[in-house]
């Protein structure tokens, strides 16, 4: 079986967002860098959570009562509901919307194990960590590219198992 490690496919220059950043600021960072999720780090650069587009949408859709229960794109919310969602995005911080149960892997972890975790936990990206410092990120797109490339060595699927950590 082909062995590719996280370090072989991960993005090394990871765009992160600092704890305390507004949700609006994080959304702008995502748009600017064309990413759908960001590791959230503290002042020392330690991972404290993950923020995804879904987290932002869920926070925004659950904020104003006028938008609850409606289907996005099917029914237009009242203008004041959109304004309220925008105000909240400006005033609330990433830690109000981020996920703190984060699946993480090390640089040596097999890509096959990362792919399995993505399926099991219904996640689109996993941070690659050294201790609690983010050294890379692997997205589903990275895994698909690795499958398409089809290169690597033999691997033992029981090595380098990922873990879910409560941050």
Q: What do the predicted segments below correspond to?
A:
Residues 122, 127-151:
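A contiguous, mid-protein "functional segment" used to position or interact
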Residues 58-61, 110-113, 122, 133, ...:
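Contiguous N-terminal and early-domain "leader" segments and peripheral loops that mark the onset or edge
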Residues 49-52, 57, 137-144:
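Short hydrophobic beta-strand motif reused across regulatory alpha/beta modules
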Residues 57-72, 144-157:
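A short, polar/charged loop-to-alpha-helix boundary motif
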Residues 1-29, 35, 40-43, 47-48, ...:
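Bateman/CBS regulatory modules and CBS-like beta-alpha motifs in cytosolic regions of diverse proteins
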């Amino acid at each position: 079986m082909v062995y590719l490690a996280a370090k072989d496919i991960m993005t090394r220059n990871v765009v992160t967002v600092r704890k305390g950043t507004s949700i609006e600021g994080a959304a702008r960072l995502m748009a600017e860098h064309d990413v759908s999720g960001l590791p959230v780090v503290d002042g020392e650069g330690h991972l404290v959570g993950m923020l995804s587009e879904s987290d932002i949408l869920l926070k925004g859709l659950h904020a104003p009562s006028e938008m609850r229960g409606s289907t996005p794109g099917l029914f237009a919310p009242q203008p004041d509901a959109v304004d309220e969602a925008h105000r909240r995005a400006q005033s609330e911080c990433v830690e109000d919307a981020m996920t703190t149960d984060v699946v993480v892997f090390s640089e040596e972890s097999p890509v096959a194990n990362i792919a399995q975790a993505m399926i099991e936990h219904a996640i689109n990206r996993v941070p690659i960590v050294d201790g609690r410092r983010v050294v890379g990120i692997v997205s589903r797109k990275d895994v698909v590219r690795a499958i398409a490339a089809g290169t690597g060595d033999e691997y033992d699927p029981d090595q380098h198992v990922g873990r879910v950590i409560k941050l």
